[in-house]
Amino acid sequence: MKLIPFPYPLNIGTDVVHLPRILRLINRPDYFHRFTRRILHEQEQRDFRTRFSLPPPSSGAEKTGLNPITPDMARWLAGRFAAKEAARKAAPAGASSLGWKDVIVRVGEADKGRPEIVYLDPMGCGETGGGRVGKLSISHDGDYVVATVLAAG
């Protein structure tokens, strides 16, 4: 049998996150803000603060522990974590070629509010710089969050 390669360079990545693991991490003393700064791009950090009505980092509230971590916050962060891991796996050069902040999860304006993954152009600045858009699906079920990314390579 003669095998014919698929005619389009497509890559797929999937990741599953156990929500209690994320909850354990972000509930550790002084780790919540460290975790969000580590995995979220600046735009995603702003989106997170806006979505959950959190004060800006300059307010000092993060040091006082005044912001209780809600299950919705944990679910949102777990979704971003899974999406970014899936995006890294779908990257044409492989997961090790991308850092956490090299990809952004954003809500697509033209696609009825569906989330999408953006591979940032290393020469761009993220928000105003260029990037490549990939398809993203995130699903939440009980203690698990799963994300799948389809990217052209």
UniProtKB/Swiss-Prot annotation:
Xref: Gene3D superfamilies: 4'-phosphopantetheinyl transferase domain
Reported consequences of knocking out the gene: Essential for viability. Leads to swollen spores in heterokaryons with a low germination rate and arrest at this stage.
GO molecular function: holo-[acyl-carrier-protein] synthase activity; magnesium ion binding
Disulfide bonds: none
Primary residence: mitochondrion
E.C. designation(s): 2.7.8.7
Compartments where located: Mitochondrion
Pfam families: ACPS
Keyword vocabulary terms for this entry: Mitochondrion, Transferase
Catalytic activity of the protein: apo-[ACP] + CoA = holo-[ACP] + adenosine 3',5'-bisphosphate + H(+)
Protein's GO biological process: fatty acid biosynthetic process
UniProt GO cellular component terms: mitochondrion
Family: Belongs to the P-Pant transferase superfamily.
Summary of the function given for this chain in its UniProt record: Acyl-carrier-protein synthase transfers the 4'-phosphopantetheine moiety from coenzyme A to a Ser of an acyl-carrier-protein. The 4'-phosphopantetheine (4'-PPT) portion of CoA provides the essential prosthetic group for a number of carrier proteins and multi-domain enzymes, priming them for the acceptance of acyl building blocks in fatty acid synthesis and many aspects of secondary metabolism mediated by polyketide synthases (PKSs) and non-ribosomal peptide synthetases (NRPSs). PptB is specific for the mitochondrial acyl carrier protein acpA.
Name of protein: 4'-phosphopantetheinyl transferase B, mitochondrial
Organism from which the protein derives: Aspergillus fumigatus (strain ATCC MYA-4609 / CBS 101355 / FGSC A1100 / Af293) (Neosartorya fumigata)
Gene this protein is translated from: pptB
